[in-house]
Structures are given as structure tokens and as C-alpha cells.
Amino acid sequence: MDVKIGVLALQGDVAEHITAFQQVLDTIPSVVGSVVEVREAAQIPSLDAIAIPGGESTTISRLIEKNRMHEVLTGFQGGIFATCAGMVLMAKSVEDPRICPLGLIDMEVDRNAFGRQRESFEADIPVQGLDAPFHAVFIRAPVVRSVGAEATVLATIDQGIVAVLQGKHMALSFHPELAGDLRLHRLFLTGLGIV
């Protein structure tokens, strides 16, 4: 099976997500896979999945609009793996009017819920679908305040929901690409039938 995964290369941990997804694909004998940087809307329809990495959500939202990617992303038939700022963009509701969310996951997100850089932290958290806790890196992370009936909560911490799944889409408020642990990238691809 040929698989092509894209990583939205507008801002954030692009190289780290490319490496993580390629490492997972390389462990699947039946898959010939590639992971590419996505800089243009025309690249998106040919992908099986796309990652929206963390960064600054207002900047990424503006660049998505500038590069005419919003409509292509909302109509994308593959799965979307979104982390940190990517989670904010996937929401139906965001409190910041500068962000034009994609509305692909029925959730309300509080961006930068953990505020300043010094409020960033790491924690081992249980995640539905994983057999052991995941070491999560939270950097000025968002928190999900509520989810609709179509969304499944995968992980919570005291401050709120930090991992959500809806259909083919997974959104995480933390940075799995910085943990050195491929289980969430693998879990996402498993949900798409790739693993």
C-alpha cells in the first residue's frame, strides 16, 4: 500500500512530525510511505493524512487563509493529526476572534490556557488506546472546555481535556513529536487503517 502523509509547513515542529511519521511508516512492511512538507493548497487533496503542528495559532490561521488552504482543509477526505495550535484550529469554537477555525472537531477550545512560556510543563498522562501513560510536553498549551456528542475524549488532566478524537481526526493540546514516543502517531495511523 502506498501512503502519503503531509505536514503543514507554515510554522511549528515540522521536521519533528516528519521524522515521527516516517519512523512509524518504516515499521510497517506492507506500506511504502512518504512524508512531505505541505506549503500549497494544491498538495493537500493527494494526501492520505496531514498533520497541523503547533506554533502560534493566530499566525497559522492567518497563513492558512493567505495560502487559500482553509476550504481545502475543511473538505479534506483524509485524517488530520493536530497538535497544540493545530488543536485550536480544528475546533468549532475558539474564544479568539483572530482565529478562523476549521470546525472539524466539535469542541470548544481555550487557546493558551496555560498562558506564558514559564507555565509550560511535562506530565505522564493516561491516554485512551495506549497501554501505558504518555509523557506529554505542554508548551503554552490549549485546553478543551467542552466536546460535542461526535467527539471522543482520549485524555484529560486537572485543567481540562487535552486529547480528542472525532472520525478520522485527532487533536492533542501537547507535543507528542517532542516526547520521543511514537505511540500517538501510530494510534492516529491505526485509526485510518494504515497500520
UniProtKB/Swiss-Prot annotation:
Active-site residues annotated for this sequence: C84 (nucleophile), H175 (charge relay system), E177 (charge relay system)
EC number: 4.3.3.6, 3.5.1.2
Keywords carried by this UniProt record: Glutamine amidotransferase, Hydrolase, Lyase, Pyridoxal phosphate
Cited PROSITE patterns: PDXT_SNO_1 (PS01236), PDXT_SNO_2 (PS51130)
GO-annotated biological processes: glutamine catabolic process; pyridoxal phosphate biosynthetic process; pyridoxine metabolic process
Keyword Glycosyltransferase on entry: no
Pathway(s) the chain acts in: Cofactor biosynthesis; pyridoxal 5'-phosphate biosynthesis
Family: Belongs to the glutaminase PdxT/SNO family.
Record's subunit section: In the presence of PdxS, forms a dodecamer of heterodimers. Only shows activity in the heterodimer.
Function noted in UniProt: Catalyzes the hydrolysis of glutamine to glutamate and ammonia as part of the biosynthesis of pyridoxal 5'-phosphate. The resulting ammonia molecule is channeled to the active site of PdxS.
Name the UniProt record assigns to this protein: Pyridoxal 5'-phosphate synthase subunit PdxT
Organism: Methanosphaerula palustris (strain ATCC BAA-1556 / DSM 19958 / E1-9c)
Taxonomy of the source species: Archaea, Methanobacteriati, Methanobacteriota, Stenosarchaea group, Methanomicrobia
Gene: pdxT
